């Protein structure tokens, strides 16, 4: 009787998307045909019931690869209408919104397209006006690529450093809350290593058989995994370029501009190329993906994030090409505006998915090694 009462109480507190994931997982747990596709299904088999914490954990463990959708005998148009990618995607959006900091800003996830647009317009206007205010004009004689003659170094360091740290801090505050609810135990070094390997290699975008995901149909492709790698490692190379340039400036006394074949410029150039190839490929795949695959309402968030990354790299490469011309001020203001828009939307856009997924991968590494000892905080 107590067990029945517990199930009734949990059913009342589940949202509609969470209740759908619970229904889908109950069917999948009875079938288990997809058990070898990814981490979601082995994690599912360790449960007979699916509470709120379990559902949010499994939803963020899902990589939206689509293999289970095309393999499922109960997928639409079957009357069971089992669509794991769609159900999981809808819960992921609720996860981001629920754990957003401050809480009121969680609503921005549901208007992600508008959020990205407003952030971009605001940032572009801000830096164009700053450039005009500091130099009196957007056009100027060539400055030999010296950005700091347009915007002082300390101003840029303060603006971008504070916004980036605040954005990451707000995002991490939500991820920590999420972690505490899905995992009552902390990780061990071996579990951290396994989760890191799975995240960095995107292991679960291989479809479980190494041939890749499904996109427009039931054909397998590794393109999504590869474009994700171009995007992630391109971003990390750009970040490394910033770190090296910061070290040059503060510790070695070497001030920008740096030659083309210097370490910061080469890292930034290679990263920029990765951030063109990767996002362009992901956008192409997003446009051709099956309508049954994922949550169509989230396409503005997905595409807005991809376009911001693409604009960041394109404007950065354009700035490098035009840094010795009288157009450098305009190019610099546009590039900085795009980067600022990206930073502003970090805690309220698609950027968050990587953090929540890594937390879920870590939970799975713990669970796989320790079984029921890993538990769920809500149990």
UniProtKB/Swiss-Prot annotation:
Q: Does the keyword RNA-binding apply?
A: no
Mutation: residue 134 to M; reported impact is: In transposon Tn3411
Which SUPFAM superfamilies does the record associate with it? Answer: 4Fe-4S ferredoxins, Respiratory nitrate reductase 1 gamma chain
UniProt keyword 4Fe-4S present:
yes
Q: Which residues bind [4Fe-4S] cluster 1?
A: 28, 31, 34, 72
Which residues are recorded as binding [4Fe-4S] cluster 2?
A: 38, 62, 65, 68
Molecular function in Gene Ontology: 4 iron, 4 sulfur cluster binding; metal ion binding
- This one is known as Citrate utilization protein B
Starting at the broadest rank, the lineage of the source organism is:
Bacteria, Pseudomonadati, Pseudomonadota, Gammaproteobacteria, Enterobacterales
Primary gene name: citB
